[in-house]
Amino acid sequence: MPVFHTRTIESILEPVAQQISHLVIMHEEGEVDGKAIPDLTAPVAAVQAAVSNLVRVGKETVQTTEDQILKRDMPPAFIKVENACTKLVQAAQMLQSDPYSVPARDYLIDGSRGILSGTSDLLLTFDEAEVRKIIRVCKGILEYLTVAEVVETMEDLVTYTKNLGPGMTKMAKMIDERQQELTHQEHRVMLVNSMNTVKELLPVLISAMKIFVTTKNSKNQGIEEALKNRNFTVGKMSAEINEIIRVLQLTSWDEDAWASKDTEAMKRALASIDSKLNQAKGWLRDPNASPGDAGEQAIRQILDEAGKVGELCAGKERREILGTCKMLGQMTDQVADLRARGQGASPVAMQKAQQVSQGLDVLTAKVENAARKLEAMTNSKQSIAKKIDAAQNWLADPNGGPEGEEQIRGALAEARKIAELCDDPKERDDILRSLGEIAALTSKLGDLRRQGKGDSPEARALAKQVATALQNLQTKTNRAVANSRPAKAAVHLEGKIEQAQRWIDNPTVDDRGVGQAAIRGLVAEGHRLANVMMGPYRQDLLAKCDRVDQLAAQLADLAARGEGESPQARALASQLQDSLKDLKTQMQEAMTQEVSDVFSDTTTPIKLLAVAATAPPDAPNREEVFDERAANFENHSGRLGATAEKAAAVGAANKSTVEGIQASVKTARELTPQVISAARILLRNPGNQAAYEHFETMKNQWIDNVEKMTGLVDEAIDTKSLLDASEEAIKKDLDKCKVAMANIQPQMLVAGATSIARRANRILLVAKREVENSEDPKFREAVKAASDELSKTISPMVMDAKAVAGNISDPGLQKSFLDSGYRILGAVAKVREAFQPQEPDFPPPPPDLEQLRLTDELAPPKPPLPEGEVPPPRPPPPEEKDEEFPEQKAGEVINQPMMMAARQLHDEARKWSSKGNDIIAAAKRMALLMAEMSRLVRGGSGTKRALIQCAKDIAKASDEVTRLAKEVAKQCTDKRIRTNLLQVCERIPTISTQLKILSTVKATMLGRTNISDEESEQATEMLVHNAQNLMQSVKETVREAEAASIKIRTDAGFTLRWVRKTPWYQ
């Protein structure tokens, strides 16, 4: 099947596919309509010339290359293309003498398909060789990174730096060229991100090596920390380069991303559970421990982490973990309630506490087993990939030694492990059957090579057979691992809500459990938010979570019994929809409040750590102060990460923002212990310049990452809501200050005033970012003026707070401070108002009564109605032709996933009127065309010509959507929305081009009996996946274009009318 993951492959395949589509249509006209096929000598000669040139270049490359895999894989591709060309030439010659020849028509269609498939194979083989060149450079850097472990002198360090630089430059250049060539936007982003991380870590590596060499040679303290810093940086760089190598080899969507994320999440959850277990059990053992203190919070965090693991599991494993979490949560509530009533030492309370303690052990064991199983399957999958890669090199070399056989045997052993962990017996048996076949073929090939016949035609054919069988085995094991995981919900809130809504609307449709997974994900996030809330707020949110959970379970039960369309189910669906809306609103309010509190000050703890690390050697309690500040910094960093994750999950962020937050949280978690180690080196080596520079490097890297995280979190939540939450928090801080002054508590006053100042500065940062993001001069001016006013109020308030703290009983000073506080509040309100400009009054106010003029003149008489005439009725508004989505007829054969993707786009576009909005009109047209394609692709109706023409019409509508979206982006004043719109719409042309090529491939197979079911199904699968991607990209483009149209330039000549068919308030 054709792959086109690079622009070069796509640019060569498109014109070939265009020529082939003409030949396919001619074939059909001859076969179905009985028409004479015209002389094809000229078009066939054009195809032959293009392909022959490609083959000639390929053969020249094979002669000069040292790449054994290229030498092995090129000849079969040459033969395939040349045979197909021969068939086309023969067909053209036969049709010259007999335009109605049936064998000639067969040659024509088979040759056409062979040309497309063979050209694709040829281009892919070329491309794989180019990728191997880049990988060789990457592996060279990987090997040289390990040399860092033996660098122990400054001379060695200088030499190491000089040698590493050119290699890094070469790798960066090759990666940059490669990412520009890729058509998959996600793969481009992954390569760029990993390469940028490697570049950022290079100075950190040199700094870490330098401090290690310095401490080792001077025999100073801190060598262990220096070693940790160096090894961490080497490990991190190696991991990123390995990720680059993995992404370079991807030719389609990324199947492995979830596995590494899930394994990492499980390990992190386990580590967190282990660290909290003693504290939790201590609270349970002590009947006098207060409810709500750190011990109870530890239990809540354990249940939260275990719940995350449960959500990553499937089937029985998932039910057991989540059921245990829920039960232990309820029992902990009961223990806390009994202790709050002073009954903590009662037999009932003691028994409950002991049951919770035992339950935590059981839960931990279940979580460990789940993590172990996922890690085993993931490790086996990754091991198979490496061993098969090595085996392919051995298979390409006729004189290869016995080590290749060992690699194959190792791959088969790992595949057997996956088979044994499979829940599906059919999948397990399929893998085991493949293992037996590959073992037999490999043994036969090994015998031939040991006899010195490795270069014989039989051995070469066997080697090719084993190579293909290994690739098929890898596909089967990958699928088995993927199927062992639960259905994946969207990563962002709107995506989850949409998936949930789709299931609620049609609970009987099989969506592979995605809708219910989305609801479970939302409920799980609700529980996580509730865990940090206190008292009635927590209970209220938990009650809403439970309500959604119960309604979803009841609806799923009805659907399972075949009653998903019953009146009871419809009533349940309506209740569930309302409950989800309530839950979403409360979750977003809770999350915004938490962001306002936790992100009000991100850098003070690291600055205090820096002060402690640079304290003079004779400072009192130097070590104790440092340890305390290091612990505070670590806790603070953890809180930032946890809150950012909640903002990603519950905020209004898009997928790229969510992934950006997750990446920055991961980096913060990794950097935090390294910063503490660097600070400890500085503490133990006062005055050491290398230690100071190294700490500064690590500190700045942490601060830069947290600033990036803060910006992304601000993107994820509504700015107006954040300002509202911050304003409310300042009011509460001001109330605390009043209490402090009344109770003569200067420290409490200082804490409140400091919090007010931090929150005000945070508001200034948010406002500054929004000004930088906007190109609307009026908005920028209004926000900047309000920000400047707020900025002027902060310092006077801090000065007044210091004055009143020094003499807290002075009423005059108290009044001055409160006046300063209220001025800050007033300035904050003005900033908030600048983000919500006043709407003009509607309807307009009546004119002043003074303007009315009364006269004595009578009004003229009313003219008589026309006699004998009946006014014509008002004509009905013209109906929009693209409103109705075609329903599937009884017995009609369609491709269900393709039809579903088309329906989802149509549902999105139907929210808006297409009058005066060409994007909506084109999107509806595309959805209807894709619905038609879902019929054609199964060959149930229509023709090859219809399939090819349908793909062309979809591509034409795609071009229209892209052109219009770019026009909207050009006029949008919001840089962030503009970038999002361009990123989404720029995917569309590539996908629509691929759709045309894949449709041509599929058309060559319709009605043919000499094609295997597997080959035909593979072509359909690729076409379906492409169609789903296209529909999703257009759907996202519609949403982003609507958002961008709100922020359009006032002087823009280009406008689109966005009129909702169903108003938002209904």
Swiss-Prot record:
Positions of region (Facilitates phospholipid membrane insertion): 935-978, 1052-1066
Region (Interaction with ACTN4): 741-764
Localisation: Cell membrane; Cell junction, Adherens junction; Cell junction, Focal adhesion; Cytoplasm, Cytoskeleton
Example GO BP: regulation of focal adhesion assembly
Listed Gene3D superfamilies: Alpha-catenin/vinculin-like, Vinculin, Vh2 four-helix bundle
Region described as C-terminal tail: spans on this chain: 879-1066
Region feature 3 X 112 AA tandem repeats, mapped onto this chain: 259-589
Region (Talin-interaction): 168-208
Linker (Pro-rich) as annotated region, ranges: 836-878
Start-end of Pro residues biased regions: 860-876
Modified sites of kind N6-acetyllysine: K173, K496
PTM comment, free text: Phosphorylated; on serines, threonines and tyrosines. Phosphorylation on Tyr-1065 in activated platelets affects head-tail interactions and cell spreading but has no effect on actin binding nor on localization to focal adhesion plaques.
Residues with PTM Phosphothreonine: T604, T672
Membrane topology term: Peripheral membrane protein
Function: Actin filament (F-actin)-binding protein involved in cell-matrix adhesion and cell-cell adhesion. Regulates cell-surface E-cadherin expression and potentiates mechanosensing by the E-cadherin complex. May also play important roles in cell morphology and locomotion.
Domain notes: Exists in at least two conformations. When in the closed, 'inactive' conformation, extensive interactions between the head and tail domains prevent detectable binding to most of its ligands. It takes on an 'active' conformation after cooperative and simultaneous binding of two different ligands. This activation involves displacement of the head-tail interactions and leads to a significant accumulation of ternary complexes. The active form then binds a number of proteins that have both signaling and structural roles that are essential for cell adhesion.
Record's protein name: Vinculin
Gene expressing this chain: Vcl
